[in-house]
Structure formats: structure tokens, C-alpha cells
A protein has these predicted regions:
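Long, Lys/Arg- and hydrophobic-enriched amphipathic alpha-helices
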Residues: 1-168
Length: 168
């Protein structure tokens, strides 16, 4: 991370990071294992499970400030994807898809990425750059309408799932 931030400080550029973990809490030990997409003990299924941990976003922010970089976020993955048009993308793909199996797959992928009880709210997005860039999804103007937009996102999410379920 420090190498990346040093490079951005020296040469410009930016980094957009998506990862999972809380933003406000101080992390203790978040080591966990996943076997076939389900949580399990880190001692179960040796060499077959993925061992992972939650990212400490506060630490990333602290390191970015050491390099005097601009830090935007966090916002949820759901907010980012809806702000940049996942609902329109899914809708357009659903219109072009004739196969029931493809529609089920599209529904499953959309739900997995945006579900507020899953990756949609668990995964966070931060943007770090040398120069201040105004990215609409991260702007303060966007923040003050958070509740309105969040309600719209939740409504859109449910509406899209309903449309896709009707098709399949």
C-alpha cells in the first residue's frame, strides 16, 4: 500500500479500492475462512478453504494522509454500483436475454453484488488520489441526499429483482 501511495504522490494517478470490512469500528481479529462460499473454522478444510480478513479502512485513510493524498469515501459497493448505473445495465441485459438460465444467472449475480444484507453493504469503496477530484458518487452534495438516494437504491433493487423474478 505504501508503495502504491508513494507512486501516486510522485507521479499522480489514483486508486479505487473495493474491499470488505467495517469503517467505523476498530478492528481486532477478523480472520475467517470460507469453504464453498460459506464461513467455516480456519482449521476446517485445510488447503481447500480461503482464509481472509476484514480490511482496516481507517488505517488506509491514515496512511494516505501520511502521503498527503486526497481520500474520498467510504461508500458502500451498492451505492457505487447504483450511482454508476448497474440498474440500467441489468435492465438492458435482461431485455436482450432470452434464456431462462441466463436470466437466473443475471439475477443471482445482481443480487450477490447489490444485496444490502450481503456484498452490497459489506463491501466498501474508497478513492485515493494526489489531486482533489470531484467524483459524483463521493461528493458532499451526494452525502446530504444519502437517505433519499439510499431509499431509491433499495426501492430500485427490489424493483429490479421483482422484474427479473417475473421473467424467470
Amino acid at each position: 500500500l505504501r508503495k502504491i501511495f508513494k507512486h501516486i504522490k510522485s507521479y499522480g494517478g489514483a486508486v479505487l479500492i473495493f474491499d470488505y470490512g467495517p469503517f467505523k469500528k476498530k478492528l481486532i481479529s477478523t480472520v475467517q475462512a470460507l469453504y464453498r462460499f460459506k464461513k467455516c473454522s480456519i482449521f476446517d478444510h485445510p488447503f481447500e478453504s480461503d482464509i481472509t480478513y476484514h480490511v482496516d479502512f481507517n488505517n488506509i485513510k491514515k496512511i494516505s494522509k501520511e502521503y498527503k493524498l486526497k481520500y474520498l469515501g467510504p461508500i458502500t459497493q451498492k451505492q457505487f454500483l447504483f450511482f454508476y448505473g448497474i440498474n440500467e445495465r441489468i435492465y438492458n441485459l435482461s431485455l436482450k436475454t432470452k434464456s431462462k438460465k441466463k436470466m437466473e444467472n443475471l439475477y443471482s449475480q445482481f443480487k450477490r453484488l447489490t444485496d444490502p444484507n450481503g456484498m452490497g453493504d459489506l463491501f466498501k469503496c474508497i478513492f485515493i488520489s494526489r489531486n482533489r477530484l470531484e467524483l459524483p458518487a463521493f461528493s458532499k452534495n451526494y452525502k446530504w441526499t444519502y437517505n433519499i438516494i439510499n431509499n431509491f437504491i433499495t426501492a430500485s433493487w427490489r424493483e429490479i429483482l421483482h422484474i427479473i423474478k417475473k421473467i424467470i
